[in-house]
């Protein structure tokens, strides 16, 4: 069964935790070979035994043996369409008769990942609710739970609601009312709503701090089920987490509270069955492409982990099961980020890395002639693959994005080269210099620009959003990723203080700062970038970009899954999620 090799692969191959292995660059003075990999914690992999990947041939055999069983699983669950119709009918009834419960119903579809079936019904419910509740005066007559839920759903769907609606829950002292401390349900939803804040919305900062402190303080006195539910929401707020991951816990929260809960749970399970079969088929396609490419044979030390490459695409596009072609094609770009990262970390001398970068900048096969054969093969195959991706986009969407795609690879290799020069020079850059370069070397721009084009955006069609309109959104995601990468790798006990992470660059500039203070500063920067990301996401309120925006947010949302380390520096939470998405 495919479940067997997935479990084996998860146990022996460490899952990715960033879009670049550069958790840090080691400071060294050896310019003949830049063996930085020996000093660093992999950003793509949660630290552990990097030499334990199963032999490619065995993995490929395991995949091929299951093609027949996978094709059998691809059949739709019994009465799948009937369950969708039943749920749609229930949602319509609630939308007509119970405004508040209809919002709870909508939230449940989002949390369980089945909202894609009911976009029309959800939009109508939100439209009606917004028309009647957007005024702070009207909100005065609703509970904390109701106002918080309304606020969050509206902001998530591009409808502006002023944070002033929460002033109704403050007393004469200007602080949140004491009686709210007993409203656990309301406080949880207030905490969730505060995750949608923009910069400068002080009341939402107060709301987050107030709700978090009270809920944390009350956890010990809660019943087991409630304590587990509240703890999960504090750790993984819905807006900043992957819906399918948090939805597993929400399934328990529904309980028997609503008559539609059972139907919705059943549909979510059917959906998951369909998604698993699709993901497994896609993984076979990725494995076939990877093995036919054969680059891991040329690059003996390159990571032979198609499962990891695919994990990124699967999670980023988890909300859109119909985008199968995009997931497979995006995985190819992820694979080359891995490969080129290994080129810069393990293979090249500084002179060779300069030639490699120039060849990519020229996008010219002949510019690779003086490179070693393995580096030459990697560069030429990159050009072939990205040219092929561009051609597929042209055939499907009618425009050729090759210039945009080439630009991302040029920028990535140039950023990698900057790191190599830093490493060779033996000095750390300033914190700002580091962050500006590292947000590019993260690979986030490569992935998101390729995804943008694969989704048919930025073409010549009237009203299409332009790639430049997404730059601030991409920048915030890249910074969030970079900082979390460095925060996660800072747990590595082998760090010596000379590695190139943001924390060490920042501490170099603030010599009296403790490690804990530097850590807190980085967390504050992450929080600021989430506020900026919220605003940019809200401003990109264009129908054509909604799927891309959700996928981009999912890239940022992967972070809490990646950095839930155990004592072995593994990521059991991410492993658990991937198992859940791919196998029973």
Swiss-Prot record:
Description of what induces expression: Circadian-regulation with highest levels in early afternoon and lowest level during the night.
Example GO BP: terpenoid biosynthetic process
UniProt cofactor(s): Mg(2+); Mn(2+)
Biochemical pathway: Secondary metabolite biosynthesis; terpenoid biosynthesis
Record: residues binding Mg(2+) 1: 341, 345
Presequence extent in this chain: 1-45
Reactions catalysed, as given in the entry: (2E)-geranyl diphosphate = tricyclene + diphosphate; (2E)-geranyl diphosphate = beta-myrcene + diphosphate
Entry's family note: Belongs to the terpene synthase family. Tpsg subfamily.
UniProt short sequence motif DDXXD motif, positions renumbered to this chain: 341-345
Residue sites binding Mg(2+) 2 per the record: 341, 345
InterPro entries, sorted: Isoprenoid_synthase_dom_sf, Terpene_cyclase-like_1_C, Terpene_synth_N, Terpene_synth_N_sf, Terpene_synthase-like, Terpene_synthase_metal-bd, Terpenoid_cyclase/PrenylTrfase
EC number: 4.2.3.105, 4.2.3.15
Domain remarks: The Asp-Asp-Xaa-Xaa-Asp/Glu (DDXXD/E) motif is important for the catalytic activity, presumably through binding to Mg(2+).
Ligand binding (Mg(2+) 3): 485, 489, 493
Co-factor binding details: Binds 3 Mg(2+) or Mn(2+) ions per subunit.
Known role: May contribute to floral scent emission.
UniProt keyword Plastid, yes or no: yes
GO cellular component assignments: chloroplast stroma
EC class name: lyase
Record GO terms (molecular function): magnesium ion binding; myrcene synthase activity; terpene synthase activity; tricyclene synthase activity
Subcellular location field: Plastid, Chloroplast stroma
Expression sites (tissue/organ): Accumulates at low levels in flowers; mostly expressed in both upper and lower petal lobes, and, to a lower extent, in tube and stamens.
Record's protein name: Tricyclene synthase 1e20, chloroplastic
Glycosylation-annotated residues: 30, 209, 322, 387, 468, 512
């Amino acid at each position: 069964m495919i479940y067997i090799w997935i479990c084996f692969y998860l146990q022996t191959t460490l899952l990715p935790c960033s879009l670049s292995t550069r958790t840090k660059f080691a400071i060294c003075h050896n310019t003949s070979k830049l063996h930085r990999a020996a000093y660093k914690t992999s950003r793509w992999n949660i630290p552990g035994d990097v030499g334990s990947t199963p032999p490619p041939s065995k993995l490929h055999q395991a995949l091929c043996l299951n093609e027949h069983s996978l094709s059998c699983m691809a059949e739709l669950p019994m009465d799948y369409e009937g369950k969708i119709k039943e749920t749609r009918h229930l949602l319509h009834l609630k939308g007509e008769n119970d405004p508040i419960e209809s919002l709870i119903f909508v939230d449940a579809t989002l949390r369980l990942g089945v909202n894609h079936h009911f976009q029309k019904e959800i939009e109508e419910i939100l439209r009606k609710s917004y028309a009647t509740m957007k005024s702070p005066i009207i909100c005065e007559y609703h509970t904390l739970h109701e106002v918080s839920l309304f606020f969050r759903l509206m902001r998530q769907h591009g409808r502006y609601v002023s944070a002033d609606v929460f002033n109704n829950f403050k007393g004469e002292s200007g602080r949140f009312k004491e009686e709210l401390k007993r409203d656990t349900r309301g406080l949880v939803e207030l905490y969730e709503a505060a995750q949608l804040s923009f910069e400068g919305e002080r009341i939402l900062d107060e709301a987050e701090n107030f709700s978090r402190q009270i809920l944390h303080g009350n956890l010990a006195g809660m019943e087991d089920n409630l304590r587990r539910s509240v703890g999960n929401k504090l750790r993984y707020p819905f807006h900043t987490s992957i819906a399918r991951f948090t939805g597993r816990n929400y399934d328990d929260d529904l309980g028997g509270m609503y008559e539609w809960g059972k139907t919705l749970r059943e549909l979510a399970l059917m959906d998951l069955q369909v998604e698993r079969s699709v993901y497994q088929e896609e993984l076979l396609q990725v494995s076939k492409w990877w093995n036919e490419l054969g680059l891991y044979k040329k690059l003996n030390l390159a990571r032979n982990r198609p499962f990891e490459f695919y994990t990124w695409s699967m999670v980023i596009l988890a909300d859109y099961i119909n985008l199968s072609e995009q997931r497979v094609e995006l995985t190819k770009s992820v694979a080359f980020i891995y490969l080129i990262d290994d080129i810069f970390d393990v293979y090249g001398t500084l002179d060779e890395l300069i030639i490699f970068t120039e060849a990519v900048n020229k996008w010219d096969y002949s510019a690779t002639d003086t490179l070693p054969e393995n580096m030459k093969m990697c560069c030429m195959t990159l050009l072939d693959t990205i040219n092929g991706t561009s051609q597929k986009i042209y055939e499907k969407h009618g425009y050729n994005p090759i210039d945009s795609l080439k630009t991302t690879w040029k920028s990535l290799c140039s950023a990698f080269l900057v790191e190599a020069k830093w490493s060779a020079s033996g000095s750390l850059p300033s914190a700002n210099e580091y962050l500006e370069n590292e947000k590019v070397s993260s690979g986030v721009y490569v992935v998101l620009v390729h995804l943008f084009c694969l989704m048919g955006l930025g073409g010549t069609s009237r009203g299409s959003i332009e790639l430049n309109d997404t730059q601030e959104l991409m920048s915030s995601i890249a910074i969030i990723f970079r900082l979390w990468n460095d925060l996660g790798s800072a747990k590595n006990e082998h760090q010596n203080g000379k590695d190139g992470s943001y924390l060490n660059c920042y501490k170099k500039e603030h010599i009296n700062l403790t490690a804990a203070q530097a850590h807190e500063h980085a967390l504050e920067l992450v929080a600021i970038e989430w506020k900026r990301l919220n605003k940019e996401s809200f401003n990109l309120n264009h129908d054509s970009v909604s799927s891309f925006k959700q996928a981009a947010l999912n890239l940022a949302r992967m972070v809490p899954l990646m950095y839930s380390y155990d004592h072995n520096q593994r990521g059991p939470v991410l492993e658990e999620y991937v198992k859940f998405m791919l196998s029973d």
